[in-house]
Amino acid sequence: MKLTLVQIFFMMLLLLLGLGMGLGLGLQMAAAVLEDSDQSLNDFWSSDSQEKAETTKEGDGTRTTETLLLSNKGVVQPVWPEETILAEDEVGGNKMLRADALFQSDKDYLRLDLMNRECNSLMAHKVKKRNHTCIPEYTFIHEELDTVKAVCKNPVVACDLKGAKCHKSSRPFDLTFCKLSKPGQVTPHCNYLTFIFEKFIIISCNDMKVKIT
C-alpha cells in the first residue's frame, strides 16, 4: 500500500512528538535524580525534626560527617540543630544502648558492604514475634568494640552531660540509621529506609554505658 504525502507527514509529526516527549521525560528523571541526591533527612523524619543530613533509600549511601555524643543512659539522641531522640543503638551487631547487652560480643562488628547495610537485612533479626508493631527507627554503629572503647583514651572535651568526663573520637564512625518507611506496619512485614552516615562520637566513659545525643 502506497503512503500519501499527508500520511508520511503525520507519521513524521508523531515521531517527532514521541521523541520530544521522551526527551522531556528523560530530563525530568535526570532532574529528579539530582534532586534526590541532595535530599535532606528531614523529609523522612518526624515533622519536629530539623536535621539536614543527606539520605538514600534501600542501602545506596551518601555520607555526612557530624558529631554524636555517647553517655550513660539508654537513649539515642543525635546532636543536630534540633535534637531528635532515636530509640536504640548498636555497635556492629550488639546493642550498645541497652545495659544488659552492652559489650557482650564482638561478632559481626564490621558490616561495611553496602548490601549488608541495607536496613531490611539489618533489622530482620529483630523481628522475633509476629503481629507486633515494627520498631520505628534504629541506629547501628559499624565499628569494632575496641575502637569505640579506645575513644576513652582521647583528651577530655567539653560536653553537656552533668558531672561527666567526655572524650571525642579522632575520626568519624560509620553509622546506619534505619527508619520505618510508613507508620503502623506490623511484624514480620516491616519495610525500612536506609540512611548511611559518618559521624564523630563523644563518649562519657564513667561506666562505659552508652547514649548518643
Curated annotation (Swiss-Prot):
CDD domains in the record, alphabetically?
Answer: RNase_A
Give a single Pfam family match: RnaseA
- UniProt xrefs under Gene3D superfamilies: Ribonuclease A-like domain
Q: Quick one: a GO cellular component term?
A: extracellular region
Residue span of the signal peptide, if any? 1-24
- UniProt subcellular location: Secreted
What are the entry keywords? Answer: Cell adhesion, Fertilization, Glycoprotein, Secreted, Signal
PANTHER family, alphabetized: INACTIVE RIBONUCLEASE-LIKE PROTEIN 10, RIBONUCLEASE
State the function annotated in the UniProt record.
Secreted proximal epididymal protein required for post-testicular sperm maturation and male fertility. May be involved in sperm adhesion to the egg zona pellucida. Does not have ribonuclease activity.
Q: Which family is this protein grouped under?
A: Belongs to the pancreatic ribonuclease family.
Protein name, entry field: Inactive ribonuclease-like protein 10
Task: Report the gene name.
Answer: RNASE10
